[in-house]
């Protein structure tokens, strides 16, 4: 099972629109589950920002997942309306 953990520092989350973290979780699940049906995803606040991907079959899979996460983050179409 692939485990993805995305943590935002508390200061960063203060500036996010309401519903942003849930929208991010929904978008990640929608885009990754067709390729990786068994994923465990955690998006939360932490003391420091971080992204962790574990449980990938190999480095190529891990890099692909990280690349997809970066694409999702850069594409703002999933962000909730103001």
UniProtKB/Swiss-Prot annotation:
Pfam families: DinI (PF06183). The keyword DNA repair applies. InterPro entries: DinI-like_sf, DNA_damage-inducible_DinI-like. GO terms for biological process: DNA repair; SOS response. Keywords: DNA damage, DNA repair, Plasmid. SUPFAM superfamilies: DNA damage-inducible protein DinI (SSF54857). The imp operon is involved in UV protection and mutation, however the ImpC protein is not essential for these functions. Belongs to the DinI family. This is Protein ImpC. The gene is impC.
């Amino acid at each position: 099972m692939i485990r993805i953990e995305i943590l935002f520092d508390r200061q960063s989350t203060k500036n996010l629109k309401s519903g942003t973290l849930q929208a991010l979780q929904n978008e990640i699940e929608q885009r990754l589950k067709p390729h990786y049906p068994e994923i465990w995803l955690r998006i939360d606040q932490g003391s420091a920002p971080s992204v962790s991907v574990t449980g990938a079959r190999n480095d190529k899979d891990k890099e692909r997942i990280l690349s997809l996460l970066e694409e999702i983050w850069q594409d703002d179409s999933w962000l909730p309306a103001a």
